């Protein structure tokens, strides 16, 4: 299985990768990282992703714009998406869900919570 992690903070990308690899050992996972929404869009045609994790606040294409694009694209709309963000209001969660995100995780989070939500996401795939 292949996961795309879209996060502009290199330290958060490294943390997400470490947590995912440590908590999903029973899955044969490959993690691909993108530092921006634009980089994610350039990466998509070269891989078949089983799930995408994206931050919201990024410098070029934000995570919600990315979710909207993916869920409206015939090739990518079936890929499950988890939004991971410091944006914690119910309105933010509803907006992400309305755009098609299957999961929403607020930073900071417990590693186990990320792993649990990712396992749910991968079952959807």
Tell where the protein language model's regions lie, with residue ranges.
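Acidic, metal-coordinating helix/loop segments flanking the phosphotransfer/catalytic sites
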Residues: 33-51, 94
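Two-component/phosphorelay signaling modules centered on CheY-like receiver
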Residues: 10-32
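The feature encodes the CheY-like receiver
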Residues: 59, 89
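Conserved acidic carboxylate
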Residues: 7
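C-terminal output helix
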Residues: 109-118
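Active-site residues of response regulator receiver
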Residues: 55, 85
């Amino acid at each position: 299985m292949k996961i795309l992690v879209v996060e502009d903070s290199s330290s958060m990308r490294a943390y997400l990768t470490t947590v995912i690899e440590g908590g999903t050992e029973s899955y044969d996972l490959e993690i691909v990282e993108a530092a921006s929404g634009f980089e994610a869009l350039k990466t998509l045609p070269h891989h078949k992703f089983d799930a995408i994790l994206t931050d919201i606040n990024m410098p070029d294409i934000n995570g919600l714009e990315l979710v909207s694009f993916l869920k409206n694209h015939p090739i990518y709309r079936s890929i499950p998406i988890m939004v991971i963000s410091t944006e914690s209001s119910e309105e933010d969660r509803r907006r992400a869900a309305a755009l098609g995100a299957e999961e929403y995780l607020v930073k900071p989070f417990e590693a186990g919570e990320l792993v649990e939500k990712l396992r749910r996401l991968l079952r959807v795939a």
